[in-house]
Curated annotation (Swiss-Prot):
(3R)-3-hydroxyasparagine PTM positions: N342
Organism for this UniProt entry: Homo sapiens
Extracellular side: 19-515
UniProt GO molecular function: calcium ion binding; signaling receptor activity; transmembrane signaling receptor activity
CDD domains: CLECT_thrombomodulin_like (cd03600), EGF_CA (cd00054), TIL (cd19941)
Range of residues in the leader sequence: 1-18
Chief location category: membrane
Cytoplasmic side: 540-575
Name the record gives this protein: Thrombomodulin
Amino acid sequence: MLGVLVLGALALAGLGFPAPAEPQPGGSQCVEHDCFALYPGPATFLNASQICDGLRGHLMTVRSSVAADVISLLLNGDGGVGRRRLWIGLQLPPGCGDPKRLGPLRGFQWVTGDNNTSYSRWARLDLNGAPLCGPLCVAVSAAEATVPSEPIWEEQQCEVKADGFLCEFHFPATCRPLAVEPGAAAAAVSITYGTPFAARGADFQALPVGSSAAVAPLGLQLMCTAPPGAVQGHWAREAPGAWDCSVENGGCEHACNAIPGAPRCQCPAGAALQADGRSCTASATQSCNDLCEHFCVPNPDQPGSYSCMCETGYRLAADQHRCEDVDDCILEPSPCPQRCVNTQGGFECHCYPNYDLVDGECVEPVDPCFRANCEYQCQPLNQTSYLCVCAEGFAPIPHEPHRCQMFCNQTACPADCDPNTQASCECPEGYILDDGFICTDIDECENGGFCSGVCHNLPGTFECICGPDSALARHIGTDCDSGKVDGGDSGSGEPPPSPTPGSTLTPPAVGLVHSGLLIGISIASLCLVVALLALLCHLRKKQGAARAKMEYKCAAPSKEVVLQHVRTERTPQRL
């Protein structure tokens, strides 16, 4: 078939007919060093593959979601072709196989000879176990896609003519679109680009090496070129010297002097123009870094030449020397989960209201009381901390703030009683329960013996102010006995530590009798008295029983005499 086409073209050329026109793409997109183009028109898989090969490319491979997005862009701007089917570079060799055992491509291969992919979008998800037999080819279409932005893949007979095809081209380097200085003159400038794969237009994100640019009305014809091994190309022309300074800085490596009708490139001090009239040669005494805004990398293969580089978050400006900020927030996908704020050389991520930024992700705030172990109730303070609160009449325990204890700051408070029986009641420390289920403050000062100084009764406790004659003069605590305050270690030979005047901390009461202890002592004493009385009663009963037994034994002989059998004599009857 290919031989017939070649012979036909030669025959037409020999007869003087013009050669077939080069196919014009209906749309194209370039991503870094790869370009993709849509060519409308009926063609079999073989015809489409030959045309792409003739343009130094191949039918498109769709190995990732990025390539699928490119197809969506091309289909949206193709004027209706997207509603039909387009060949891509995926085919099934002759033979049959089980698609379930052949990976995501079901045994199909790319025209590049491999089956590497991280993406697939088959129209028929389940083949019901039916084997696939080649040869088959794949076309994409958005007509029956459930998601318009994700065209589906359909198996087709390779001899069937599709409505068009997609080609893919790879280039070692690309150029950015021409930079035009803003102003009144810029509005009149019109640029038309042409690519090696016959795409023409004014809206390109990147142009591969070999692309041309026609600048009207200046009459400029520029070409995207790059030295061997370079990945970033630049715009140039065969004629030496600068062109209009408003377009790409006149092509000058350093500065462009906009002399009317005769623009000229200038180099920094110590450097000279090269033969092309646009490049500069650095002097041996000049530092390379003086020529670039951020970093300068000398080219060891070409003495005097260099390349400028920028820090992360910046890119080279059109003059290839200055650095301009990259707006990271316009990238797709966005670097932030919700809101992105661009900064000089970077960006900041922010979250919507009621969300928190945690490890680069926006998450709903977690209730700080979720894992709290509060005995009664938890009160959030902020997004990370909380406070345990207690019921009325209770307060947190200082050393265990998640637990509660009874609290009373008056001379009398209601007791905490069992609501079922009312037989079990508790009072705070320093209070005693009366008959009316009321906790009454124990007046330690009235009882005496607790303070040798001036005693002030307080709710639940007391305060002892030591007199001037005391070893702890002016000390405020619960005792003025230095031995008790010092813990009883009066014979250690060490002087007692000086108390802090005016201390508000109440030390542990040494010798203070707790109300519960008083009740316990009373109950124990009563039990002891009852036990003694019981013991006396038992001894008296035992002594009485022994005496009765002895009396019984002593009286036994007389009782036996009395109880012996009495013999009676028979008395004769008188007549």
